Amino acid sequence: MKSLSLLRYLAIAIIVLLLDQLSKWSALSNLQMGIPEPVLPFMNWLLLFNPGTAFSFLAQGSGWQRWFFTVLGLAASIYIIWMLYKSQSDKLLCIALSLILGGALGNVLDRVMYGAVVDFIDLHYANWHWPAFNIADSAICVGAALIIWGELRKSFGKSAQSH
């Protein structure tokens, strides 16, 4: 039974990975580097390569960050798979970890194939732009938010029971 549940959570990660890679393939096929394509009043498609990490942190490195973040992403993925195996009774946590796993693998694949992560979603208000991101980044953020929400629910549940 445990392996069937694990397969379900791994399927979520694979779906995230496929959606991420298909969206990046579309961006690479249809967008020109650095030229915004308006989609909505607050959103552009904007093809960029990010050799760093979130918010382009360490993007100016000499190239070491490609393999460092690749190894880090693979190590995190192995740990997440182990966590999925051990935590199957907590469905919210497993869904969150599956989203993070799919996103991490999507960005690792980019680093291996392109030497950088492919970003293409540009949210903005007037002249202020949020750093460009992708589906993998979104899945990682949603997964992290679900983990925080789950922990807060547990914490407040325990607090309410003790009063």
Swiss-Prot record:
Q: What is the membrane topology listed in the Swiss-Prot or TrEMBL record?
A: Multi-pass membrane protein
GO cellular component: a single term? plasma membrane
Look up the record and give one Gene Ontology term from the biological process aspect: proteolysis
Could you say which EC number(s) this protein's record lists?
Answer: 3.4.23.36
Q: Cross-referenced InterPro entries, in alphabetical order?
A: Peptidase_A8
Kindly give the Pfam families that the UniProt entry links to this protein: Peptidase_A8 (PF01252)
The record lists the catalysed reaction(s) as: Release of signal peptides from bacterial membrane prolipoproteins. Hydrolyzes -Xaa-Yaa-Zaa-|-(S,diacylglyceryl)Cys-, in which Xaa is hydrophobic (preferably Leu), and Yaa (Ala or Ser) and Zaa (Gly or Ala) have small, neutral side chains
Q: Name one GO molecular function term.
A: aspartic-type endopeptidase activity
State the pathway, as annotated in the record.
Answer: Protein modification; lipoprotein biosynthesis (signal peptide cleavage)
Whether Ligase counts among this entry's keywords is: no
Subcellular location(s) per record = Cell inner membrane
Residues forming the catalytic site: 119, 137
- Family as reported in the entry's similarity comment: Belongs to the peptidase A8 family.
**Described purpose of this protein according to its UniProt entry:** This protein specifically catalyzes the removal of signal peptides from prolipoproteins.
Q: What name is this protein filed under? A: Lipoprotein signal peptidase
- What species was this sequence derived from? Polynucleobacter necessarius subsp. necessarius (strain STIR1)
